Swiss-Prot record:
This is UDP-3-O-acyl-N-acetylglucosamine deacetylase. HAMAP family: LpxC (MF_00388). It is an enzyme of class 3 (hydrolase). It catalyses: a UDP-3-O-[(3R)-3-hydroxyacyl]-N-acetyl-alpha-D-glucosamine + H2O = a UDP-3-O-[(3R)-3-hydroxyacyl]-alpha-D-glucosamine + acetate. Gene3D superfamilies: lpxc deacetylase, domain 1 (3.30.230.20), lpxc deacetylase, domain 2 (3.30.1700.10). Its EC number is 3.5.1.108. Zn(2+) binds at H79, H238, D242. Belongs to the LpxC family. One of its GO terms (molecular function) is UDP-3-O-acyl-N-acetylglucosamine deacetylase activity. InterPro entries: Ribosomal_Su5_D2-typ_SF, UDP-acyl_GlcNac_deAcase, UDP-acyl_GlcNac_deAcase_C, UDP-acyl_N-AcGlcN_deAcase_N. It comes from Paramagnetospirillum magneticum (strain ATCC 700264 / AMB-1). The keyword Nucleus does not apply. Its cofactor is Zn(2+). One of its GO terms (cellular component) is membrane.
Length: 307
């Protein structure tokens, strides 16, 4: 298999979920081996490049925020990264004029649409993957996440909320481009009505609304969105969407199975750090042409290993 990039540039404008600021973003084709990178065009100088890597993850409160050595940040990258994974985009330069990726409708679907409109082209460089060789796990109270060996890439996620509108949900999916688009990409981020004021007081969710999030009422029994849910278990499917995006920061596509229980951005990033801290837990492999087990693509491991 070969690496892939966009056929042409394409952009969008929206608001940041947490900042509430209007932001314009343009996705550009990129050369093979350059990976996924963000460029803050509102900041002059070379420090404006922010690599999309696990080692660049800083703040994980309610989102995944990347930060480079110069202190330049790009927040809420997980939905876009999930879409890039779902479309198997290896190399892309993302120009953005603010500190946060636009939330769009709260899912990965708008970003998938942008990529489909731009088109995708194969490049000469072969695609490589990180093959999980043994179980790696992280536990933080009731939150756990693990990676185990597998011939493909699959995700199982479990959540359990006191709110009866959510309650306990579990979802498993073998991830290919088709299953991601149909079963995961449209699941929106979600929150609780009574938490909005607290989040905004801490500088979060300032751009959140019923147009870009599923909101559960203060009793925990009802979804406030007039259009209801896109999937019966949309909440857990969105957690899968987040996990796919966060795992795409690994530095190469994964050949393994991810299992998350109440896990969030912080736990998944801790899991990647634990994986790369153990050289016996993984190996780099070239994905054979026509491989049925080919996982989502990401950027070459050499970049991640130096992080």
């Amino acid at each position: 298999m070969r690496q892939r990039t966009l056929k042409s540039a394409i952009g969008c404008t929206g608001v940041g979920l947490h900042s509430g600021a209007k932001v314009t973003m343009v996705l550009h084709p990129a050369e093979a081996g350059t990976g996924i990178r963000f460029r803050r065009v509102d900041i002059a100088g070379g420090g404006a490049i922010v690599p999309a890597l696990w080692s660049s993850v800083g703040d994980t409160r309610m989102n995944t925020c990347l930060k480079n050595e110069a202190g330049v940040v790009v927040g809420t990258v997980e939905h876009l990264m999930s879409a890039l994974a779902g479309m198997q985009i290896d190399n892309c330069l993302i120009e953005i004029n603010g500190p946060e990726v636009p939330v769009m409708d709260g899912s990965a679907a708008p970003f998938l649409f942008l990529i489909e409109c731009a088109g995708v082209v194969e490049q000469e460089a072969p695609r490589q993957a990180i093959k999980i060789l043994k179980r790696v796990a992280i536990k933080d109270g009731e939150r756990t996440a693990s990676l185990t060996p597998s011939s493909g890439f699959s995700v199982r996620f479990e959540i359990d909320f006191g709110a009866s509108a959510i309650s306990r949900q579990e979802f498993f999916v073998n991830l290919t481009r088709g299953t991601f688009k149909a079963e995961v990409s449209r699941a929106r981020t979600f929150g609780f009505e009574q938490e909005v004021a607290m989040l905004r007081a801490h500088g979060l969710a300032r751009g959140g609304s019923l147009d870009n999030a599923v909101v559960i009422d203060s009793t925990g029994t009802k979804v406030l969105n007039d259009d209801g849910l896109r999937y019966q278990d949309e909440f857990v499917r969105h957690k899968v969407l987040d996990a796919v995006g966060d795992l795409y920061l690994a530095g190469a596509p994964l050949l393994g199975h991810y299992h998350g229980v109440r896990a969030g951005h912080a736990v998944t990033n801790q899991l990647l750090r634990a994986l790369f801290a153990d050289a016996t837990a993984w190996e780099l492999t070239t994905i054979a042409p026509g491989s049925a087990a080919a996982p989502f693509a990401a950027q070459p491991l050499a970049i991640a290993a130096n992080g």
